Design a protein with these regions (language model features):
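N-terminal extracellular ligand-recognition/capping segment immediately after the signal peptide
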Residues: 125, 336-349, 356-382, 388-395
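Extracellular fibronectin type III
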Residues: 290-308, 830-831
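Acidic Gly/Asp/Thr-rich repetitive segments characteristic of extracellular carbohydrate-active
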Residues: 311-360, 866-873
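Extracellular calcium-associated, cysteine-rich motifs in secreted modular proteins
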Residues: 689-761
Length: 891
C-alpha cells in the first residue's frame, strides 16, 4: 500500500542534514521547522545538546545585576518569522526580580561549544531584537581573538534576510571546547538611556557549518515548508529567491527527495518555472550561487508541496486543506466510545490512537454517544461521513474538534441537554486554532454553548453546514439562571497572519444569538485582528442577536436573513467597536436581504439592516463601512435570493441522507413556520430542551452495518466499485490513480466525490427514475432548463416535468455525470447540481439496488430511487411509494 506522507518531522530531517541548526526560544512551541529548539528562560547560564554538540550560554564579563532572558515578539512569531522573532538577550536583574533593559556599558554572551569534530567549522548567528529596542553593533571573538567586528543588530526585522547576522570560521580540536563571545560596542557619543535603545544584544539562532549567507540565496518562494504552494493553471510552480550579493549565475536543483536533487537549469534570473508540479509530491530544491570567478556556493535545501483543492466543490480560504490524502484508511466499525481505553474500530480510537495522515471511513451508521470531549490533535485527517450506510453518522453527548489541514464532511452533531453534567463540554463542532481546514455539509444542533467555534483560526472554510436549535435557556454554568444562550457560532479566522476565513452557504435556523459572533481578536501588537468573509448564508428566526462582534476586516455580502416569530433584533450586522485594541475595524456590506414577517424585503440600509455601536471608550477615527471589498472570496458568490434557494436545496448532512430534523429546518425556513415552543422561554422555534422538538427518540437515525465482503482490501473503496473502476479490489490502491486529467484525485478521493453528490447505482438496461424535487427543495416551482432526451455513448437520460429518467445499454468504467439545471418559474433564479450514475456489471452486496428476476435487464426495467440512491418499490396508482418504512408521494 502506498503512503504519501508529508510531515514536518520529515522536513526537519531533510533540512538538518549536514548541519546543526538551533532556534533559541522562550517557548517550546515556537521552533522554526528544520531547527532544534533551545528554550531559555531567565538564568545566568543555559545549556542544550543537539546532534552531539553541547552549547552552554553564559553572560560575558560581570554577572552582577544581569541575567540571560528569553524574549519574543508575539506579532513577529505569528505573522513573520519564528526564527528571528524570539531569542535570548542580556537584561538587568534587580532585587525584586525585575529585568529592565540595559542601557549603559558593554554587554556580552559567551557560548562554550563542545563535541565538534576536528577541522574547520563555521557558525552563523542571527541578532534581531524582538523587544523593539535598538542595539549597538557587536564584535565576535573566538578563543579570545577578535574575528568579526561591527556587526549590525536589527530591531524587529520581519525576515531572516533583514535580520542582523554574524558569520565566523574557526578550527576545532576533538575533545576541546570552542569559546565564542558576542560583545556589544556602544557608541560613547550616543545616549542609550533615551527612547527605545539598549546596549545589550540578542541571539536568535545558531547555524553550524553552512556557507556564508552573503554567498547563498535566501527568501525562497514558495516559502520553505509551504504545504499549499501556489500553482498556475498549467500546474506549474514558479520558484524565486533573493540572489546572493556575489551571484552571477544560479544553479537550480530540484527533486522529490532531499538527498536526490538534480540540476534542472542554470539561469541569470532569480526565478525558475517548474512545469507539471504534482500535488501528490513533496518537492525539494536548492540554489547554488556562482560568482564572477566561477566559484560556486552550495545553498540550503528548501521544500514545498503544490496545493490542490480539498475536493472539487471546496471554496474559500480553507479550500486547499490536505486532509488524509496519501495516508492510511481507518474504518469505524463500532458505535461505542471509551475515553480511558479507546477500542480499535471506534471513532475515538481512530482520532486519538492512530497517527499520521489518514482518511476515516464508516462501516456503520447510527449514533455515537461521546463520553467526553474529543479533539483531533493530528494534522492531515479526513472524516468522510458520506461513506456511512443507512442515514449516516450522528454524534451526541460531547463536542468534537478538528485540527489543521483537516477535511470534515457529512457528519451530524446533536449534543443534547447536559442534565447537570457540564464537564463533557457544551459546544458542538469546531476548528479552533486551525490553519487550512474545511468543514462541509455538516449538521449541528441542540448545543448548550455555541454550535460551532473557530477562535484563533486562519485559512479556514465552513460551508453548506446547518446550525440549528441551539438550546436557549438550558442552564449554562457561566450564566445566571434563566439566561438565554442559544448561540449558533463564534467565528474566528484570518488571525495571526492568516489571509482570511470563509463562512458561506450555511443555514442558521432557530438560534437566539451569535448568528454569527465575529471573533477577530487582537494581534501580537494589540491591534484589531481578523479577516472574515461571510457571504451567501441564510438565517431564520434568530432572537435578540443576529451577526455582531468585531474583526479588522469583515465582508458581509449577499446573505439572506428571514425574520421569524421570535426575532427582536432587526439589524443583521452590528459592528461592535469596543475599544479593546488599536487600529481599525471595518466592513464591506453589500447585497444582503432581510425578509420581514409580512414578506416584504429590505435591502442594505445603514442603521436599519446594519450599524455600528461604540463602547469601552473606543475613539472612532476611520470609516467603518467601506465601498470596496478588502480581499477576494475565492468562491462563486450568488445574489442573496439565489443563495436562499441554493442553500435550502443543498445544506447539512445530506449524504447519505438528510434526517427528519434537518428536513424540518429546511421546510420551516422555506415557509417561515415554526413547530416548537421553548419549555422555559415560551418562544416559538427557540427550544430550551431537545425534547421541545423531536428529541433523540424522535430522530430517524437508525443503526446499520456494512456486510463483511464490502471492502476486501480495506482501502476505503467497496469491492463492487473497484471492479467497476478497474482498480484492484484485493490490494490497497487508494492512493493511486492521481493524474493531471482527473485533477490529481486519488482512487479513494474519486470514490468519496461520487458519494458526496446525489448518486445512483444500477445494472445496464435498468431504468433509473429520479424525483428531482427533494434535490431542489428551495425551488418550490421549478422547471428543468435542459429538457428532452440526451444520449451519449450508450447512456440515455431524459426529463419529464420534475422527473429524470436514465438508462445505459452497457456498463461503464467511470460514473456518468448529469448536470441538472433548473429555473424557478417565479424568481427566474437557476441552479445546477451534479447527479452521478454508476452503471456496473459488478456483483452488488446488500444495500445496493439490484434488479429482480421479474425485471430482466433486456426489458428496460424501471426503478424509483430515494435520496440515498436506494431503490424503492414502484408507485401504486395513487403515486404512493413505500421504501424502508417511509412514504414517498409522486405528485
Amino acid at each position: 500500500m502506498k503512503k504519501l506522507f508529508f510531515t514536518t518531522a520529515l522536513l526537519g530531517l531533510a533540512l538538518a542534514a549536514g548541519a546543526q541548526r538551533i532556534d533559541i526560544n522562550n517557548s517550546q512551541n515556537r521552533t522554526e521547522d528544520g531547527f532544534e529548539g533551545w528554550v531559555i528562560g531567565t538564568a545566568t547560564q543555559a545549556s542544550t545538546t543537539a546532534d552531539g554538540i553541547t552549547i552552554t550560554a553564559t553572560i560575558d564579563g560581570t554577572q552582577q545585576g544581569r541575567t540571560l532572558k528569553g524574549e519574543w515578539w508575539k506579532d513577529g512569531v505569528n505573522k513573520y518569522s519564528k526564527l528571528v522573532s524570539d531569542g535570548v538577550g542580556v537584561y538587568g536583574l534587580d532585587a525584586s526580580g525585575n529585568t529592565p533593559q540595559l542601557q549603559t556599558g558593554e554587554v556580552g554572551i559567551t557560548l562554550t561549544i563542545s563535541g565538534l569534530s576536528t577541522g574547520e567549522h563555521s557558525l552563523m548567528a542571527y541578532h534581531n531584537n524582538p523587544s523593539g529596542y535598538n542595539g549597538p553593533k557587536l564584535d565576535v571573538y573566538v578563543g579570545g581573538t577578535l574575528k568579526v567586528q561591527g556587526v549590525e543588530q536589527s530591531n524587529r526585522a520581519q525576515t531572516t534576510t533583514l535580520s542582523g547576522q554574524s558569520y565566523v570560521k574557526f578550527q576545532a580540536q576533538e575533545g576541546q571546547p570552542v569559546v565564542v563571545t558576542y560583545r556589544t560596542t556602544p557608541d560613547p557619543s550616543f545616549d542609550y538611556t533615551q527612547g527605545y535603545n539598549t546596549t545589550s544584544l540578542f541571539i536568535n539562532a545558531l547555524i553550524f557549518d553552512r556557507p556564508n549567507p552573503l554567498t547563498t540565496a535566501s527568501d525562497p518562494t514558495p516559502e520553505n515548508t509551504d504545504e499549499h504552494a501556489e500553482v498556475a493553471d498549467d500546474n506549474a510552480v514558479t520558484l524565486s529567491w533573493t540572489a546572493a550579493e556575489v551571484a552571477r549565475k544560479h544553479h537550480v536543483f530540484v527533486g522529490t527527495a532531499p538527498d536526490a536533487l538534480s540540476e534542472v537549469a542554470v539561469t541569470t534570473d532569480a526565478s525558475y518555472r517548474l512545469a507539471q508540479a504534482n500535488p501528490m509530491n513533496t518537492y525539494y530544491w536548492r540554489i547554488d550561487e556562482e560568482d564572477a570567478a566561477g566559484q560556486t556556493y552550495e545553498g540550503d535545501v528548501w521544500t514545498f508541496r503544490p496545493r490542490r483543492l480539498a475536493f472539487p466543490e471546496a471554496e474559500g480560504y480553507g479550500r486547499f486543506a490536505i486532509g488524509g490524502r496519501g495516508g492510511t484508511v481507518y474504518h469505524v466499525t463500532s458505535l461505542d466510545d471509551d475515553i480511558q481505553n479507546p477500542q480499535p474500530g471506534t471513532f475515538r480510537y481512530g482520532i486519538t490512537q492512530v497517527h499520521g495522515p489518514r482518511t476515516i471511513v464508516f462501516d456503520v451508521a447510527g449514533v455515537i454517544t461521546l463520553k467526553g470531549r474529543l479533539t483531533c490533535s493530528d494534522k492531515y485527517v479526513t472524516i468522510a461521513g458520506q461513506t456511512a450506510p443507512g442515514r449516516g453518522i450522528m454524534f451526541r453527548g460531547a463536542p468534537f474538534g478538528m485540527q489543521s489541514d483537516g477535511i470534515t464532511r457529512f457528519i451530524r452533531m446533536r449534543l443534547g441537554y447536559h442534565n447537570g453534567n457540564v464537564d463533557k463540554g457544551l459546544d458542538g463542532l469546531g476548528m479552533a486554532g486551525n490553519d487550512h481546514a474545511i468543514m462541509d455539509h455538516c449538521s449541528i444542533s441542540w448545543t448548550i454553548d455555541e454550535g460551532f467555534s473557530s477562535r484563533n483560526a486562519k485559512n479556514i472554510t465552513l460551508q453548506r453546514t446547518l446550525i440549528s436549535e441551539a438550546l436557549n435557556i438550558a442552564d449554562h454554568p457561566n450564566y445566571e439562571s434563566g439566561k438565554a444562550h442559544g448561540f449558533a457560532a463564534t467565528i474566528g479566522g484570518g488571525e495571526l497572519g492568516g489571509l482570511g476565513s470563509s463562512f458561506h452557504h450555511n443555514l442558521l435556523a432557530h438560534n437566539e444569538g451569535r448568528n454569527w459572533s465575529i471573533s477577530g481578536g487582537l494581534d501580537g501588537a494589540g491591534a484589531y485582528d481578523g479577516h472574515h468573509d461571510m457571504f451567501n448564508n441564510v438565517c431564520y428566526n434568530w432572537g435578540g442577536r443576529a451577526t455582531d462582534g468585531g474583526t479588522h476586516e469583515g465582508q458581509f455580502v449577499a446573505n439572506y436573513y428571514k425574520v421569524g416569530p421570535s426575532t427582536t433584533q432587526m439589524a443583521l450586522l452590528n459592528a461592535q467597536l469596543e475599544g479593546t485594541g488599536s487600529g481599525t475595524q471595518a466592513y464591506y456590506v453589500s447585497g444582503n436581504i432581510r425578509e420581514n414577517l409580512n414578506g416584504s424585503k429590505t435591502q442594505d440600509a445603514l442603521n436599519d439592516t446594519y450599524k455600528y455601536t461604540l463602547s469601552g471608550g473606543q475613539k472612532l477615527d476611520w470609516t467603518v463601512f467601506q465601498s470596496e471589498p478588502f480581499f477576494p472570496s475565492y468562491a462563486t458568490i450568488e445574489t442573496a435570493e439565489q443563495a436562499f434557494q441554493s442553500v435550502l436545496s443543498d445544506v447539512g448532512c445530506n449524504q447519505p441522507e438528510l434526517d427528519n430534523h434537518d428536513e424540518r429546518m429546511i421546510q420551516e425556513t422555506l415557509h417561515g413556520t415554526t413547530s416548537t415552543v421553548g419549555c422555559k422561554s415560551k418562544k416559538k422555534g427557540l427550544i430550551d430542551r431537545e425534547t421541545d422538538a423531536e428529541g433523540f427518540e424522535g430522530l430517524n437515525i437508525v443503526d446499520a452495518t456494512r456486510p463483511d465482503n464490502w471492502d476486501t482490501d480495506q482501502d476505503g473503496m467497496p469491492d463492487w466499485w473497484e471492479q467497476t473502476m478497474g482498480t484492484n479490489a484485493s490490494a490497497a490502491d487508494h492512493n493511486d490513480g492521481a493524474t493531471e486529467l482527473n485533477g490529481y484525485m486519488t482512487n479513494l478521493e474519486q470514490y468519496l466525490d461520487f458519494l458526496a453528490h446525489p448518486h445512483f447505482v444500477a445494472k445496464p438496461n435498468e431504468q433509473i427514475v429520479v424525483d428531482l424535487r427533494p434535490y431542489f427543495a428551495g425551488y418550490t416551482n421549478f422547471e428543468v432548463i435542459d429538457d428532452g432526451e440526451r444520449a451519449s455513448d450508450g447512456f440515455i437520460y431524459a426529463y419529464e416535468g420534475t422527473t429524470l429518467t436514465a438508462r445505459a445499454t452497457w456498463a461503464f468504467q467511470q460514473p456518468r455525470v448529469v448536470n441538472v439545471a433548473v429555473r424557478d418559474r417565479q424568481s427566474g433564479n437557476t441552479i445546477t447540481r451534479c447527479f452521478y450514475f454508476c452503471l456496473t456489471e459488478a456483483p452488488l452486496p446488500a444495500g445496493i439496488a439490484t434488479p429482480t428476476a421479474s425485471q430482466p435487464h433486456a426489458t428496460g426495467s424501471s426503478a424509483l430511487y430515494n435520496l440515498k440512491g436506494q431503490r424503492l418499490s414502484a408507485p401504486n396508482k395513487k403515486g404512493l411509494t413505500i421504501g424502508q418504512g417511509r412514504k414517498f408521494i409522486q405528485k
